[in-house]
């Protein structure tokens, strides 16, 4: 498991990179497509997850999940595309999907981009913008439409969160914590 998010109904979604670095050479890491997202639910309100289903399967190292109404937005490794999935019959397995944002292969550092040197995060902030790490874009999801806009600065690939006022905090390989003291809406683009 590499990432956990909750939807508005308390269901937990867990991204699993099942092929990540299974040996010292990384054999199959980006080719096996055995990543998945599990959905866990508490059926009786006791705070313990009673049911787990494989919500989406056969993914290429899923690295971002964001609940949107009754959809779950997902981005995989080596692509900038965002695909939304939903379960329409209540069995806990996604049976419908749609492309929210199509931008094609991830190529920030060339075609052989490292698994670590790619975006993650997908954090919905209080300014109604969706922030990700490492890439200089942020997104907005309104009326079923996913829009991207450039933002200044360089993030990190490891973690992103915000406080109650919308200040962004992130970490990287050399410093334990960084923060944006001014909200990104005040940054020049």
Regions found by a protein language model. Name each.
Residues 1-189:
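Beta-propeller domains with acidic blade repeats across secreted/periplasmic ectodomains
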């Amino acid at each position: 498991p590499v990432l956990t998010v909750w939807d508005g109904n308390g269901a937990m979604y867990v991204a699993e990179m099942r092929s990540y670095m299974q040996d010292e050479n990384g054999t199959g890491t980006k080719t096996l497509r055995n990543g998945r997202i599990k959905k866990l639910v508490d059926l009786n309100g006791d705070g313990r997850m009673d049911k787990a289903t494989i919500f989406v399967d056969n993914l290429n190292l899923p690295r971002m999940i964001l609940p949107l109404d009754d959809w779950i937005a997902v981005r995989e490794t080596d692509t900038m595309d965002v695909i939304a999935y939903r379960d329409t019959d209540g069995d806990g397995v996604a049976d419908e999907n749609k492309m929210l944002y199509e931008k094609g292969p991830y190529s920030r550092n060339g075609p052989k981009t490292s698994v670590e040197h790619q975006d993650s995060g997908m954090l919905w902030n209080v300014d109604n913008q969706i922030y990700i790490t490492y890439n200089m874009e942020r997104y907005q999801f309104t009326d079923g439409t996913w829009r991207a806009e450039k933002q200044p600065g360089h993030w990190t690939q490891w973690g992103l969160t915000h406080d109650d006022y919308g200040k962004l905090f992130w970490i990287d390989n050399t410093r334990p914590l960084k923060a944006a003291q001014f909200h990104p809406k005040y940054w020049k683009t």
